[in-house]
Design a protein with these regions (language model features):
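Gram-negative bacterial Sec-dependent N-terminal signal peptides
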Residues: 1-21
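Low-complexity repeat regions of mature extracellularly deployed or surface/particle-associated proteins
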Residues: 21-239
Length: 239
């Protein structure tokens, strides 16, 4: 597991360095029979980075997509690293803004596997619309050492007609020879000068031949000068 964490950390540093160099960057590297594929897409006012690395027969696929456009900004990052295992990482950030509104979406997905299967999916949407303001952040991490690890994080937000909306979603799944799944769903709305904030955190850790599941759902909506906030946290550990 130490090798797995070290490999993931080194790839994350590489991703941070690459992110400052351009809007859409895809990097893939493989050795000793490994297969790696990286795809990055950025449309307007957006940054997208995808990095995949595989070795010793491992398979790594990283897909990053960011849209942004007009008064919206989207930042998407995906990393997949596999050593004799399979790592699939998918990250999507949307944003938009539309007609005077502003939106920021940030999405990060990391999947790393040693002889196992790691699947990570992250999506952050946000909107804005007219004079609304929306901010959305989603992070997903799946780490597997001869087991199955699945992490799924989705953060939405809206804002709409002058409101402020904020969403934060964080999901982590870690296993050592077992099965670990973590899913976090966060929604926020607001409208007409209202404010809404929602935060969700899900963590799942499992040991040898054990199964651990974590499910988190946080939802907050406000209408006409209202204010709402919701927070949800679920941490499950089976060592």
């Amino acid at each position: 597991m130490k090798r797995l964490l070290a490999a993931t950390l080194s790839v994350s540093f590489l991703m941070a360095a690459a992110a400052s160099a351009g809007d859409a960057i895809a990097v893939s590297t493989s050795s000793n029979g490994g297969r790696a594929s990286a795809t990055a897409t950025a449309v307007g006012n957006a940054s997208s980075v995808a990095i995949a690395g595989a070795t010793r027969g491992g398979r790594a696929v990283a897909t990053s997509n960011a849209v942004g456009e007009r008064h919206g900004y989207a930042d998407s990052r995906a990393v997949a690293a596999a050593d004799r295992g399979v790592a699939l990482s998918d990250s999507r950030a949307d944003a938009r803004g539309l007609f005077g509104g502003s939106a920021i979406a940030d999405s990060e997905s990391i999947a790393a596997a040693i002889g196992g299967l790691a699947i990570s999916h992250s999506a952050a949407v946000a909107d804005g619309t007219f004079f609304g303001h929306a901010r959305s952040r989603s992070a997903s991490t799946a780490l597997s050492h001869y087991g199955v690890s699945v992490s799924d994080s989705i953060a939405t937000s809206r804002g709409l007609f002058g409101g402020h909306a904020s969403s934060n979603s964080d999901s982590t799944a870690l296993t050592y020879g077992g099965v670990s799944t973590s899913r976090a769903r966060v929604i926020s709305d607001a409208s007409l000068h209202a404010s809404a904030e929602s935060n969700g955190l899900g963590v799942s850790i499992s040991g040898l031949l054990l199964r651990s599941d974590s499910r988190v759902h946080a939802e907050s909506r406000s209408v006409r000068f209202g204010s709402s906030r919701s927070d949800a946290v679920m941490i499950r550990v089976r060592p």
